[in-house]
Structure formats: structure tokens, C-alpha cells
Amino acid sequence: MLSKRVIVCLDVRDGKTTKGIKFKGNVDIGDPVDMARVYYEAGCDELVFYDITASHEKRGIMIDVVRRVAETIFIPFSVGGGISSVEDMRDVLLAGAEKISVNSAAVKNPKIITQGAEAFGNQCVVLGMDVKKVEKSEKIPSGYEIVINGGRTYMGIDALWWAQEGERLGAGEICLNSIDADGTKEGYELELTALISENVNIPVIASGGGGIPQHLGDVLKEGKADAALIASMVHYGTYTIPEIKDHLKSQGISVRDQLQ
């Protein structure tokens, strides 16, 4: 049985790690390089770095920060935000990331998924999906709609269709973020996560809403996710990575042991 992964997300604005609720009210909480080192040493399985302003404000990825973070940790590391071309992908991978995450750019230009997969391999391309629950309709039969630009723009695209299309185009993994749950610490969107996980053949990372260790247990079991992304619950010192993993083990969930 493959071990489930605990992934820490570092949202970065203007070179500082930040955290908001439903993409609003962001406050600075620390230096991303220092925080990356802390989480790596604590035993997180992967790290995700998002330049959360890059897509909206059309700024390039902060390559220097990416390089310094990648030099600090020795676990898989993905980078997203402002990546809109194969050249952007190459720059980030050369800076030290193992994976690149495309979200808004892929919605606007789906070919970027295929181009990235062909250039660097499927395993390097993560399809980031920001999703909001809406009324079911002929256009959005699943009741979950794709939004972009930090949740500001509704795209009229059904989330289930887009997940399957992303896989067909070459994405090797999906990072599925519920805007409704993001930052609330009230639990992941289990229905959404299970819907996507059951209907694609690539790993799904659940994102948005983790507040207590049991929330991870729920989404890894009921939501059938392959990994859970966390931020608030560790950024503010509420829980540690070892505490979270110990809880998951107590639930019969296979997780990787901390590196010694």
C-alpha cells in the first residue's frame, strides 16, 4: 500500500509567507526559506511554494526565493504561480523544483499541460484546480465550478470535466483546492475530493480546510485523496508534523516515517 503524503503549503506574497482565509485578508507569517527548513526537518513529505500574486498581477516567479528554498530542503518540492509557458517551467525546474503547478494558465491555454509533460515528463506537471461549489446545471453538472485568479473569476467550466481533461492532456497529479474550505480550518471538501479521486487515474492532493489531524484522516480515507495539503494548522504552531502523522497512523493510514 502506497503511503499517504502530508504536504505543507507555503503561499508567498512579496517574498514573505502569507496565509489568508478564502484568498482574502492575507497576513505575513514568516520567511519562506526558514519555514521550508523547519518543515523539512520536522518530517513533511513534500513542500509546495505558491507565489499567490504572480498570476493575478502577471509577475514572474521569484526565482531567487525558489532557488534558496530548493537548496534548503531535500524532499520533493513543487512551485506554482505565474507559470504561463514552457520557458517559465524550465526556469523553475532549473532553480531546483521537482514539479511545477499550473492553474490559471492551464485554464486559459490547456496546451501548456501537454507541452510541459512532453518537455519534462508527466510527473513534473501538477494541475492546480481552484473550485467553488455552485448550483448544478447543464453547464456545471457536478455542481463544482473552476475559478481562477485567486477565486476572483468564474470560468463556467465543470471541475470533474476539467480534472479528467487535465489528465488526458498529460498532468501527472492534481492539486484540488476548495475555495469554500480554504483557510477555514473546518475540514476538507470531502464530497468534491472523492468525486475527483474516484474519476481520475492520477494522484489527487486535497487542499483547503485542514484544521485538525482528523481532517486529514477524513480526506485521505473518505475523500480517497493520495495526499493532504496543510498550512494554517502548522504555520501557527497548533500542531506539528509528527503529531499529525502519529494521528494518521492511529487511524490505520500508512504514512512515511520522519527522516532521521
UniProtKB/Swiss-Prot annotation:
Q: Which reaction does it catalyse?
A: 5-[(5-phospho-1-deoxy-D-ribulos-1-ylimino)methylamino]-1-(5-phospho-beta-D-ribosyl)imidazole-4-carboxamide + L-glutamine = D-erythro-1-(imidazol-4-yl)glycerol 3-phosphate + 5-amino-1-(5-phospho-beta-D-ribosyl)imidazole-4-carboxamide + L-glutamate + H(+)
Q: What class of enzyme is it?
A: lyase
Gene3D superfamilies this protein is in? Aldolase class I (3.20.20.70)
Give one Pfam family: His_biosynth
One GO CC term, this protein? cytoplasm
Q: Which domain of life is it from?
A: Bacteria
Q: What is its main location?
A: cytoplasm
Swiss-Prot/TrEMBL keywords: Amino-acid biosynthesis, Cytoplasm, Histidine biosynthesis, Lyase
Q: Kindly list the places in or outside the cell where this protein is found, as annotated in its UniProt entry.
A: Cytoplasm
Concerning PANTHER family, the annotation shows:
IMIDAZOLE GLYCEROL PHOSPHATE SYNTHASE HISHF (PTHR21235:SF2), IMIDAZOLE GLYCEROL PHOSPHATE SYNTHASE SUBUNIT HISF/H IGP SYNTHASE SUBUNIT HISF/H (PTHR21235)
Q: What does this protein do?
A: IGPS catalyzes the conversion of PRFAR and glutamine to IGP, AICAR and glutamate. The HisF subunit catalyzes the cyclization activity that produces IGP and AICAR from PRFAR using the ammonia provided by the HisH subunit.
Name of this chain's protein = Imidazole glycerol phosphate synthase subunit HisF
What organism does this protein naturally occur in? Desulfatibacillum aliphaticivorans
* Organism ancestry: Bacteria, Pseudomonadati, Thermodesulfobacteriota, Desulfobacteria, Desulfobacterales
Q: Which gene encodes it?
A: hisF
